[in-house]
A protein has these predicted regions:
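Domain-level signature for soluble enzymes in the chorismate/prephenate branch of the shikimate pathway
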Residues: 1-133
Length: 133
């Protein structure tokens, strides 16, 4: 279930078209691939956006330190959402969407931020979609 463009871009087949209920809907799609071919798929598009999730120690300035590093590396946050970790008092997961112009700088920012986090995962990297509105 994706656009014809996405299917052509990643060498896939459209199973069903126009399944949305809102014609102005913007949906993120996920390509699940064998790790050995994932890099080949990624190279077909310009990677300039990513989704990240991380947790931090519950201490003063921990989030500010992470955000300062992203700023230093010229990483633009387009979304940040904190959700409590169920069963762990005062612990939160931070879901962050970022856009960037330089993939190497993005990877360097992840390397710089990682030691400050309790856990960090890059959920996905892809080309930012363009709005038709």
């Amino acid at each position: 279930i994706c656009s014809q463009y996405a299917a052509e871009l990643y060498g896939m087949k459209v199973l069903e078209e126009s399944i949305e209920t809102n014609k102005h809907n913007f949906t993120r799609f996920l390509v699940v691939a064998d790790p050995w071919i994932a890099d080949d798929l990624r190279k077909q598009s310009k990677v300039n956006k990513a989704n990240i999730v991380f947790s931090l120690p519950h201490s003063e300035g921990s989030l500010s330190q992470v955000l300062s590093i992203f700023s230093f590396y010229k990483i633009n946050l387009t979304k940040i959402q904190s959700l409590p970790i169920i069963g762990r008092e005062w612990q939160y997961l931070f879901y962050v969407d970022v856009i960037f112009n330089d993939y190497l700088r993005f990877r360097q920012s992840i390397d710089a931020v990682s030691p400050l986090t309790k856990e960090l995962k890059v959920l996905g990297e892809y080309e930012e979609g363009k709005s038709n509105i």
